[in-house]
Amino acid sequence: MARIGDGGDLLKCSFCGKSQKQVKKLIAGPGVYICDECIDLCNEIIEEELAESSEVKLDELPKPAEIRDFLENYVIGQDAAKRTLAVAVYNHYKRIQAGDKGRDARGETVELAKSNILMLGPTGCGKTYLAQTLAKMLNVPFAIADATALTEAGYVGEDVENILLKLIQAADYDVKRAETGIIYIDEVDKIARKSENPSITRDVSGEGVQQALLKILEGTQASVPPQGGRKHPHQEFIQIDTTNVLFIVAGAFAGLERIVSDRVGKRGIGFGAEVRSKAEIDTQDHFAEVMPEDLIKFGLIPEFIGRLPVVASVTNLDKESLVQILSEPKNALVKQYNRLFDMDGVELEFTTDALEAIADQAILRGTGARGLRAIMEEVLLPVMYDIPSRDDVEKVVVSAETVNDNVLPTIVPRKPERGERRDKSA
C-alpha cells in the first residue's frame, strides 16, 4: 500500500498501483486506497452491466402466443385486442434488437419503421390494464399520461414533453432504459379537433396537441425539463430519443360508432346489397370495422392517424365477463378482499348470486370493470368498519340481497374454545 522512498512515505492505489503523484485524487479506506481513475472505471463497468440487464434481449423476448397467455392470467376477454397487442409489442422490440434495420433475403438493408398502437373502446373495458400488464411482463418503464391536460406550446397547460418526463421518472432517471419504455396516452379522443374542416381559430387543446405529439410519436431527440413545467431558455434539459419508445394511444371515442354505422350502412344500397336494419348495425362491433376515414371524420388529423398504424379495439364487457373479472384473474377483486379480511382473522365469502348482482350494478352504472371496486367498497363498508373491533366473527357471507337491497352481510360467529365455555359456565 505504502512505499517508503527518498521523499518519505508514498501512497499508491491498491488497484492500479499508481502513486498519489500520478493521479488527481487518492481516497483512503481501512488499509486500502483507490484513485479517481479506478473509481471512474468501476462506474463505467457498473453502468454497462445495468444497461445490458435492462435491455429486452431478443432471445429472451416472449413470442406473441406467450404474451397473449400472460395477458390471459390478468385480463378477462378482449381476445382480439390481446392478439393485436402481442404481435405489435413483439415486432416493436424485435425492431429495437435489429437496431432499426434488418436485411432481407437478398442481403439488402431494410429500415424497420415504428408501429405505435391506437386502442379504441368504451371506458372500463381494460385498455389501460392491458398496457400496464404488458409493461409488467416485459419489465420496461411505463408511464400513463392524460391527453386532456396537454396544450400546444406557449399556452396554459402541460407541454407534450412532460409525458416523457413521467417515463424518465418511471425509469429512475435512467434515460437509456427509458428510451425503450412504453407510454400510454389516455383520453386521446378528447383532443380531436372540433370539426372535420380546418378552422381559422387556434385549437390549442385539440388539433394543436395532435400536431405537437407528431414528432415524439415518430421519433425525435426531445429536450425535457427535469422538473417538469414550461421550458425557459436558462434551464438545463434531459435529452431523450423517442425512436424506440412504444406509444399506446387510447380513448373511448364516444360517437365514433355512429360514423362507422353511417359508412357501413351505405353498403346496403342496390339490388345485390345485404339489407340490415339500423338495430342490427348498432349491435355489431363498430370499432372492429374502423377505417382511417372514420377517425378523420371524428376529428383526428391524417398525420396523427398515420403514426398509429396498429389499431386494437376492445368491446363492452358482458355480465359473464364481469363475474369472471371479479373472481378469476391472479389479482381478482374477490381475492384482494379475501386477503384483507384474512389479515383480521375473518373468512369472506361471496355467493354466486352476489357476484352476478355486482356485475349487474356495474352494467347499470355503465362503468364496466372500473366500477367493480366502488361497488365492492359500498357493499363491504359496514363490516370493514365493524369487524376490526370484534374478535367473535368467524366468517362474513355476502349475498345478492346485500348488493341489491342494502341488507347487511351475514355474520357467522366464532365458536368459543373449550376453555372459554368453562369460564362462561362458571
UniProtKB/Swiss-Prot annotation:
Domain of life: Bacteria
Sites where the protein binds Zn(2+): C13, C16, C35, C38
Ligand binding (ATP): P122, T123, G124, C125, G126, K127, T128, Y129
SUPFAM superfamilies (UniProt xref): Glucocorticoid receptor-like (DNA-binding domain), P-loop containing nucleoside triphosphate hydrolases
Keywords: ATP-binding, Chaperone, Metal-binding, Nucleotide-binding, Zinc
The keyword RNA-binding is annotated on this UniProt entry: no
Chain's role: ATP-dependent specificity component of the Clp protease. It directs the protease to specific substrates. Can perform chaperone functions in the absence of ClpP.
HAMAP family per record: ClpX
Protein's name according to its UniProt entry: ATP-dependent Clp protease ATP-binding subunit ClpX
Organism whose genome encodes this protein: Rhodococcus opacus (strain B4)
Lineage: Bacteria, Bacillati, Actinomycetota, Actinomycetes, Mycobacteriales
